A protein has these predicted regions:
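Conserved glycine-rich Rossmann-like NAD(P)H-binding loop of the short-chain dehydrogenase/reductase
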Residues: 35-49
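The beta1-alpha1 cofactor-binding region of Rossmann-like NAD(H)/NADP(H)-dependent oxidoreductases
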Residues: 45, 64-76, 104
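Conserved glycine-rich cofactor-binding loop
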Residues: 12, 19-21
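Flexible N-terminal pre-Rossmann segment of NAD(P)-dependent oxidoreductases
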Residues: 1-11
């Protein structure tokens, strides 16, 4: 990865949506660059897999199952941290439907999440 050229030793990164896709790739790249990680996803199984990869880089990894649209869950996670140097606010979702057909409650959720 390109971040390998950057030294992030003694830095802590929090990555939301870290269980899959771009969030997973970011978390792994940050670990490869030496950062310790706090990873958040809605799925424990995904967090376990990503955490295992991160630990291969000798980085500390703390994982939390969390719905980032739940303010209290996020607030509690943040309160437990000594420091956060890097934030990758990656969690997101979409509804595969033409925007004129999306239900109001679904649109509100997507806006809140993204």
């Amino acid at each position: 990865m390109y971040l390998k050229k950057i030294n992030l030793k003694n830095k802590t990164a929090l990555v939301t949506g870290a269980g899959k896709g771009i969030g997973k790739a970011c978390a792994i790249a940050l670990a490869e660059a030496g950062a310790d990680l706090i990873i958040i996803s809605r799925t424990q199984k995904d967090l376990n897999a990503v955490s295992k990869i991160i630990k291969k880089f000798k980085s500390k990894c703390t994982s939390y199952v969390c719905d980032v649209t739940n303010y209290n869950q996020i607030k509690n996670i943040i309160a437990k941290q000594k420091k956060i140097d890097i934030l990758v606010n990656n969690a997101g979702n979409n509804i595969p439907e033409h925007f004129t057909k999306v239900k109001k409650k679904d649109m509100e959720y997507i806006v809140k999440l993204n």
